[in-house]
Regions:
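Bilobed periplasmic-binding protein-like "clamshell/Venus-flytrap" ligand-binding domains
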Residues: 120-124, 184-192
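Cytochrome P450 core scaffold surrounding the K-helix E-X-X-R motif
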Residues: 151-156
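Short catalytic-loop micro-motif centered on adjacent basic/acidic residues
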Residues: 1, 33, 187-190
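Short, intrinsically disordered, charge-balanced linker/junction segments flanking boundaries
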Residues: 194-197
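Conserved glycine-rich beta-strand-loop-beta hairpin in the small C-terminal domain of fold type I
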Residues: 137-141, 157-163, 181-186
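Active-site donor-binding acidic/aromatic loop of nucleotide-activated sugar
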Residues: 165-167
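ALDH superfamily catalytic-core signature
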Residues: 3-149, 171-173, 177-178
Length: 197
């Protein structure tokens, strides 16, 4: 089985009940750290590509971003520029993928609304200012969620879509502590040029 931990529990219980051998590949919240020594343009281009490939519906897609607090604005702008370069349009662009279906899109939209209601600043990256409300393809633009907190569902569940929570850190140790206090991620991404970090 490949998929979410919550579903895997049911699959594993059914397999155990029937003594069926099982291998599980589970997703998780794969963090991405951009360090102070990173080339911001290069890092944000790679993060945007990783997050938007298949509309973020890849088990190893970056799930949240940890950035130095003084570089947050520059990094957000880099993500916007990288997205616009890859996908100047999205709705009619065959290279920009839809999410799995209406139910999945509604789940992602609920994460966005929950984050807004709990104080996040949501930046919708829509380079051509297209109207996504009048489409039947279940496409969603990138939503950057600034100020994401642990109370928000977007930080509690695997996203599997084009939503990117951003949290800031003062010191690299704080970013590492942030990762270590959570469940073990499936993947982790680091962007930086300082070997001591």
């Amino acid at each position: 089985f490949t998929g979410a931990t919550s579903v895997a529990r049911h699959v594993m219980a059914a397999a155990a009940k029937n003594l069926v051998p099982l291998t599980l590949e589970l997703g998780g919240k794969s963090p991405t750290i951009i360090s102070r020594s990173a080339d911001v343009a290069s890092a944000t281009e790679r993060v945007a590509m990783g997050k938007l490939m298949n509309a973020g519906q890849i088990c190893l897609a970056p799930d949240y971003l940890l950035v130095p607090e003084e570089k947050e604005g520059e990094i957000i702008e880099g993500l916007k520029a990288a997205t616009a370069k890859m996908y100047p349009t999205m709705l009619a662009n065959p290279d920009y993928t839809s999410v799995l279906g209406a139910r999945h899109r509604e789940r992602l939209e609920a994460h966005v609304e929950d984050a807004r209601a709990k104080g996040a600043d949501v930046v919708v990256v829509n380079p051509a200012n297209e109207d996504f409300s009048k489409q039947n393809t279940n496409k969603m633009p990138l939503h950057i969620i600034r100020g994401a907190t642990d109370e928000m569902t977007v930080m509690q569940e695997e996203i599997f879509g084009p939503l990117l929570p951003v949290r800031t850190y003062k010191a690299v140790d704080g970013a590492i502590d942030e990762i270590n206090r959570r469940d073990r991620p499936l993947g982790l991404y680091w962007f930086g040029q300082d070997e001591l970090e």
